[in-house]
């Protein structure tokens, strides 16, 4: 550098702006702060050049430039602060991001071009293949028609798939709704059954209404005569509605008499005497009169009587009104209890 300056001075080309540029550069590299105070190379230059005017002009220019740099901070200078470092890092990052974006754009364009080229090559192949195939039949198709048909088929296939998926979704929703309704119905049924069981088990007969008890008793006694089904948990109102067109049931006294006299034999001939036998038989050892013997009745399923065999026939209780006993036409001597043989005396009972 010194040689260049000396060469310029000796050659007569005194270029002050070049010297100022050199001084400014040296000041930036050697001293980062203010340029006041001078440097040892300034003395060396003045001694080496041995020119008074040049030294004065050089010093004044150097001082002016240093003063201006002190007042106005340089845009290119680096003073070692954190802000400047961060700015430099940001600029480098932006530059790198810009490079990355440019590379991505290039690759994207390259992919697009490659896709277009491949589509064009495929189109050419399809055209040649179709033309070669249809050349025998005298037909000639273009690639556009073939691609149009392919696109139509793809659209139809996609539409069918969409319809199937919609039908499946609708079916799933319907099944879900049906399942929800079924669950609700089952829960309601369970609650209704629980309520019925609770009221059926918890309410005692003494806590029910007397009308309900009377109707239930009538239904229990006359279910066969009325032809109605009998449920013990029927209410009085329901049973009355069902029995609206039926004849009124008989009273309790008549029903008891009917139940006690429900024998298969006619009421006017409960005990009939046997015909007289000509020859003596095994019945002669019986000491009972002949007119009190009974016909042997056929065996029935209700013969499990728990009464002893000697008390099969018991005397009837005396009845005060004569109208009740008028229909009994049996002789009075056969009403009393007599010791009969247990195998020859069988009574049937409904």
Curated annotation (Swiss-Prot):
Q: Which domain of life is it from?
A: Eukaryota
Q: Which PANTHER family match?
A: NUCLEAR PORE COMPLEX INTERACTING PROTEIN, NUCLEAR PORE COMPLEX-INTERACTING PROTEIN FAMILY MEMBER A2-RELATED
List, alphabetically, the InterPro entries matched. Answer: NPIP, NPIP_N
Q: Where is this region: Disordered?
A: 306-325
Disulfide pattern: none
**Organism (species):** Homo sapiens (Human)
Which family does this protein fall into? Belongs to the NPIP family.
Q: What is this protein called?
A: Nuclear pore complex-interacting protein family member A3
């Amino acid at each position: 550098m010194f040689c260049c300056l000396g060469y310029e001075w000796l050659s007569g080309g005194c270029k002050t702006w070049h010297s100022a540029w050199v001084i400014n550069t040296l000041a930036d590299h050697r001293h980062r702060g203010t340029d006041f105070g001078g440097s040892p190379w300034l003395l060396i230059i003045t001694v080496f050049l041995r020119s008074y005017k040049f030294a004065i002009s050089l010093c004044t220019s150097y001082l002016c430039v240093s003063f201006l740099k002190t007042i106005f901070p340089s845009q290119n200078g680096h003073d070692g602060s954190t802000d400047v470092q961060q700015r430099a890092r940001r600029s480098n990052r932006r530059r790198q991001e810009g490079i990355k974006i440019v590379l991505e754009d290039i690759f994207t364009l390259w992919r697009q071009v490659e896709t277009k080229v491949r589509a064009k090559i495929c189109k050419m192949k399809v055209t040649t293949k179709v033309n070669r195939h249809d050349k025998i039949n005298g037909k000639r198709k273009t690639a556009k028609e073939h691609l149009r048909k392919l696109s139509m088929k793809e659209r139809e296939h996609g539409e069918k798939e969409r319809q199937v998926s919609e039908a499946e979704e609708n079916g799933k929703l319907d099944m879900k709704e049906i399942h929800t309704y079924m669950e609700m119905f089952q829960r309601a049924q369970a609650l209704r059954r629980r309520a019925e069981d609770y009221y059926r088990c918890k309410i005692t007969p003494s806590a029910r209404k007397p009308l309900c008890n009377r109707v239930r008793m009538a239904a229990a006694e006359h279910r066969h005569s009325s032809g109605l089904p009998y449920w013990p948990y029927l209410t009085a109102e329901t049973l009355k509605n069902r029995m609206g067109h039926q004849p009124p049931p008989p009273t309790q006294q008549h029903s008891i008499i009917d139940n006690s006299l429900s024998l298969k034999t006619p009421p006017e001939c409960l005990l009939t005497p046997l015909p007289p036998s000509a020859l003596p038989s095994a019945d002669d050892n019986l000491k009972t009169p002949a007119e009190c013997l009974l016909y042997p009745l056929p065996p029935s399923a209700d013969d499990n009587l728990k009464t002893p065999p000697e008390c099969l026939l018991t005397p009837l209780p005396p009845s005060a009104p004569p109208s009740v006993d008028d229909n009994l036409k049996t002789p009075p001597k056969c009403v009393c209890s007599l010791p009969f043989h247990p195998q020859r005396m069988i009574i049937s009972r409904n």
